[in-house]
């Protein structure tokens, strides 16, 4: 596998309102634990769309991994000015992750017009990656459902790789990290 998409809940869907909240430490560690074996097996690219929450935390994780591994980060935003209506702290977070990216592009080269741009993003990213790592629990629907459904279709048609991190997996990392301290 050469490329993987990472997506999941937006931070506010998880009740997290700061990028550096305590919960983010556990989420980032969980993402790292799932990415690291893939990176060690030759994963070259992690692709995110620059959404708040899981995707930007994944961008932070990839930036950390770059110190020791030849991994690259691509940010493929669904449209121009995605962060224009975000608060200042979230805009800063997005720009910090963007600075760490090895590649950046817009899937539709215009500002937001309709939800179809999100569907276009999902389709483009799935069509151009070998798999997806999702922080998504089937028991708690949210924004990742649309990507998950489309990725599941790709898996059925072309053996697309899906690694879904649910809340139980997150809880295991929390417990493991708390035992370590």
Curated annotation (Swiss-Prot):
Pfam family membership, one: YpsA
Coiled-coil stretches: none
HAMAP family linked: UPF0398
Assigned protein family: Belongs to the UPF0398 family.
Protein name per UniProt: UPF0398 protein lmo1889
Protein species of origin: Listeria monocytogenes serovar 1/2a (strain ATCC BAA-679 / EGD-e)
């Amino acid at each position: 596998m050469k490329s993987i998409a990472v997506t999941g809940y937006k931070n506010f869907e998880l009740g997290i309102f700061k990028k550096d909240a305590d919960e983010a430490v556990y989420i980032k560690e969980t993402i790292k634990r799932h990415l690291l074996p893939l990176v060690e097996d030759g994963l070259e690219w992690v692709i995110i769309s620059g959404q708040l929450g899981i995707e930007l935390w994944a961008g932070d994780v990839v930036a950390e991994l770059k110190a020791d591994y030849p991994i690259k980060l691509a940010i493929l935003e669904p449209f121009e000015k995605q962060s224009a209506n975000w608060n200042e702290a979230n805009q800063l977070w997005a720009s910090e992750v963007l600075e760490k990216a090895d590649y950046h592009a817009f899937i539709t080269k215009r500002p937001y017009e309709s939800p179809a741009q999100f569907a276009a993003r999902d389709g483009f990213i799935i069509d151009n990656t070998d798999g997806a790592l999702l922080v998504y629990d089937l028991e708690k629907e949210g924004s990742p459902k649309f990507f998950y459904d489309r990725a599941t279709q790709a898996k059925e048609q072309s053996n697309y790789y899906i690694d879904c991190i649910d809340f139980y997996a997150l809880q295991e990392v929390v417990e493991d990290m708390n035992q370590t301290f």
